[in-house]
Amino acid sequence: ATGNVWAKDGYLVIIKTGCKYNCYILGKNKYCNSECKEVGAGYGYCYAFGCWCEGLPESIPTWPLPDKTCGTK
């Protein structure tokens, strides 16, 4: 706990497509961890083939996006 009361957890989402960041090595995952940290999260790992971030800033959108489902234009 960093004492940041505004943090949330969630799947990282690609804003353009509404898709999750895909990952294949479940659990501890370097790619997810670095992508999550890139947007200010505490850490990230691969859960159900998507990058899950813990301790995300409130301002970072997470999956699912209200107006975009992955795969539809």
Curated annotation (Swiss-Prot):
- Answer whether the UniProt record assigns the keyword Secreted to this protein: yes
- Where is this chain's protein located in or outside the cell? Secreted
Q: Which InterPro entries match?
A: LCN-type_CS_alpha_beta_dom, Scorpion_toxin-like, Scorpion_toxin-like_sf, Scorpion_toxinL, Scorpion_toxinL/defensin
Residue ranges of the propeptide: 71-73
- GO CC annotations, alphabetized: extracellular region
Q: Where are residues bearing Cysteine amide located in the sequence?
A: 70
* One Gene Ontology molecular-function label: toxin activity
Where is it made, tissue-wise?
Expressed by the venom gland.
- Disulphide bonds in the chain: 19-70, 23-46, 32-51, 36-53
SUPFAM superfamilies assigned? Scorpion toxin-like
Q: Which family does it belong to?
A: Belongs to the long (4 C-C) scorpion toxin superfamily. Sodium channel inhibitor family. Beta subfamily.
Protein name per Swiss-Prot or TrEMBL = Neurotoxin Cex13
Q: Which organism is it from?
A: Centruroides exilicauda (Bark scorpion)
